[in-house]
Each structure stands twice: as C-alpha cells, then as structure tokens.
C-alpha cells in the first residue's frame, strides 16, 4: 500500500514530482546491509526502513547510521504500536511514516536532508566493473586500490555515479513490477522489486 501511494503521488517525499524508481532489499555500503525500500529519482535517493507490528528496534540504530552514509534522506515506516517509541529516540534527523490499522499512511515527521556522506560506503555500493566504466579507468589494479584512488573524487561526482548506478540496476526490475502489479500492489508483486541477489548488485 505504501508503494501504491507513493506512485500515485498520495505521499510526497520529494520536493518535485519526478519519475520514481523503487527497489526492495537493496544492498549498500561497507557492511553490505540491505535497505527495505529505496526510492530513486535522477536527483535524489531515499531509504525506507520498515518496522512492522512485531518488529523490534534492536538493529535500528545501526541501520539508520548505515543509511545516512549515502542516502539523501531516510524514513522509518512504522505501525501504530511503534509511534511513541520511535518519537522518543534522541536523534530527529530521519523522517517517520505511520501506517494505521485502516491502511492509511501518515507523514509523522519530514526527514532532514543529509549533507555529509561516506565516500567509502558510496564506492563499496558500486561494483568495480561499473566504476571503471563510469570513470573511464583501466581495470588493471586490485579493486581496493581502484576504490582508494576514487576517494580523491568529490562527493558530488561519486553521488552522481551512485544515482546512475541505482537507476540502471533498479530500472528493469521496476518496469517488470509496473507491468505485473495492476492497479493495486500485492505481496507477490513486491518480490519482483527485490535486489537481494549478489549477482545483480555486484556484477
């Protein structure tokens, strides 16, 4: 239901109405964590962490700290029972979305735009073959040496490369999803968006 509302512009997480790609279980960063949902436009990437009714918050701090290293903003999508707990957390930079029992979604708090990123995590999200192609580098060094050299690039350049990479990798799966889902998305449709395959993200 969240994906449907985003695609129907019922929930606006972007300043401008742009073409949005959505990925599910997208691997990222040095720790090779998986984002529940990633929303990508040509200018911005948003990570969505989902905490359903029976989920706990044990890993939430680590997940949030991982997201902020390369995503432009981060939201936590929660069920009604988690509202007070999520609002009591000391840091307020991430946004809060609440899905109610009657399947409505409320924007509880707008996420702040993140300004500082980790070059290491950005580079580790992209495979060497893509990095060499994008930056026109000969693939005659060890992967770690290539990434080390690329840390000399500006954050702006690396973020642009990452955005294009995400668009490429998520684009074909999202097209399949749009074709299959009909007017309303079902759980089976969401699995089409899954990027939880090493061969897909690291080729």
Task: Annotate the PLM regions.
Residues 24-27, 50-56:
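Short, flexible loop segments at the rims of nucleotide/cofactor-binding pockets, characterized by
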Residues 32-34, 43-45, 69-71, 91:
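Short connector loops at helix/strand junctions that flank enzyme active sites
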Residues 168-203:
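C-terminal non-catalytic accessory extensions
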Residues 41-43, 100-103:
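Short acidic-glycine loop/turn motifs at beta-strand connectors
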Residues 55-98:
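Catalytic cores of nucleic-acid endonucleases
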Residues 37-39, 44-53:
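Conserved catalytic cores of phosphodiester-cleaving nucleases, focusing on short active-site segments
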Residues 104-178:
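A conserved mid-domain beta-alpha-beta active-site/ligand-binding segment of alpha/beta enzyme cores
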Residues 3-42:
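Active-site metal-binding core of divalent-cation-utilizing nuclease and nuclease-like domains
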């Amino acid at each position: 239901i969240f994906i449907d509302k985003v695609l129907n512009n019922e929930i606006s997480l972007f300043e401008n109405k742009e073409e949005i790609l959505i990925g599910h279980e997208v691997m990222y960063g040095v720790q090779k964590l998986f984002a529940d949902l990633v929303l990508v436009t040509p200018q911005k990437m948003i990570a969505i962490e989902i905490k359903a009714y029976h989920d706990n918050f044990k890993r939430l701090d680590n997940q949030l700290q991982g997201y902020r290293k390369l995503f432009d903003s981060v939201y936590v999508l929660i069920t009604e029972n988690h509202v007070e707990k999520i609002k009591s957390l000391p840091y307020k930079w991430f946004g809060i979305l609440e899905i109610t029992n009657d399947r409505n979604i409320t924007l509880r708090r707008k996420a702040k735009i993140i300004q500082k990123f980790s070059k290491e995590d950005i580079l580790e999200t992209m495979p060497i073959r893509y990095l060499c192609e994008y930056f026109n580098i000969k693939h005659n060094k060890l992967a770690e040496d290539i990434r080390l050299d690329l840390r000399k690039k500006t954050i702006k350049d690396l973020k642009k490369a990452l955005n294009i990479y995400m668009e490429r990798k998520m684009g074909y799966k999202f097209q399949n999803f749009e074709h299959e889902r009909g007017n309303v998305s079902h759980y089976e449709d969401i699995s089409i968006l899954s990027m939880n395959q090493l061969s897909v993200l690291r080729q």
